[in-house]
Amino acid sequence: MKLELTPRQRKILWATVRRYIATAEPVGSKTLAQSYNLGVSTATIRNDLATLEQVGLLFQPHTSAGRIPSDFGYRVYVNDLLSSANMDGIPNDAPQPEPHPALQQLLDQLNRELGDDLDSFLQRVAQLLAHLSGCIALITPPQGPVVAVHHVQLLSVGPGRVMVLVVTDSYQTHSALVSPPDWPDDRREDLEDELQLLSNFLTLKLRGKTFAELQDLSWLKLDEEFRAYSHWLQQLLRSVVQRYLRPSLGQVFSAGMTELMRQPEFSQAQRMQAVAQLLEEGSEQLQGMIGLYSTPGCLFTSEAALSAPSAREKASSSTADQDPSHNVPVIIYIGSENPLESLHHCTVIASVYRRRSAPLGTVTLLGPTRMAYERSIAAVQTVASHLTRALA
């Protein structure tokens, strides 16, 4: 059955959620009447609050308290009411659609300071996002078949072992140990020279090719000089590609535990410990939620989150000309929508950053369900958009 709310009930739900997000205190009819121009008596507001509670949008933590939003109430707020400010008579009490007035400038500054040190850059971005949002920020590094090769180097690391180092165009380094080829007898004394010659050849042949393209690369037509190595080169590339395209469990740049501890919802040690344990020990579970794995775009597929267009998606068409980051889609899990039970008291907001329209990595905020949704959504969009441009 479709939920039908009167315009006044929509206003009251909107105001209740906004007030609770701002204060973390249950909201009563008197507070709403004093703080918002609803144009009705406290008795009428009280009746509407009771109706909103009956349909599951609000609840009372105890009998004498005001109301607070349920997970369902937050979902209606995010999917429907965020885009309705200044519409249907819903008041607009200083909304904050931008994550921080200087976020983009701060991201640009980090780019200049850290240059090609991608890992340090992503860690600093996670710290910045956590500081501005008051939530835990999680960023996965670039992965997937669209990352391309920039340089290849072969090194002898001991008897019978060769290390292949691959530097990608996103400034990451990947390595694998392989057995050396069967060197021709007249070249065994020139091992280092041969490895350098092969390194130069591989760099020239592979630069600009994605890891997906390496899987189908043919080594049948080689110059006479390298023909003896064709089988070994095929095995080497297969080893590198399989190692790179295998899901990376555990590599997540994170920050914000201290910020989250300041939230009143996490004053209970049990809740904080559950999140901390997930971040420290549950890398496989966490990557199952925020990782890309081998399926492009498999990030967050909650039916509840996708059952209606998000407010941000609705608003993006009117704001795209002002800020392209508003076109970045986000997926949101609220409370019990989270697949992990330890996050049933949390909201997760996530997006992907891309190259060539394919997902590279993820940007995620994890915080209480009482989250400043407008600001948090905008922050995730801004960071994802920046990483897409920076790693293009």
UniProtKB/Swiss-Prot annotation:
Source taxon at top rank: Bacteria
Keywords: Repressor, Stress response, Transcription, Transcription regulation
Single GO BP term: negative regulation of DNA-templated transcription
Organism annotation: Synechococcus sp. (strain JA-3-3Ab)
Family: Belongs to the HrcA family.
Role: Negative regulator of class I heat shock genes (grpE-dnaK-dnaJ and groELS operons). Prevents heat-shock induction of these operons.
Keyword Transmembrane: no
Name of the featured protein: Heat-inducible transcription repressor HrcA
One GO MF term attached to the UniProt entry: DNA binding
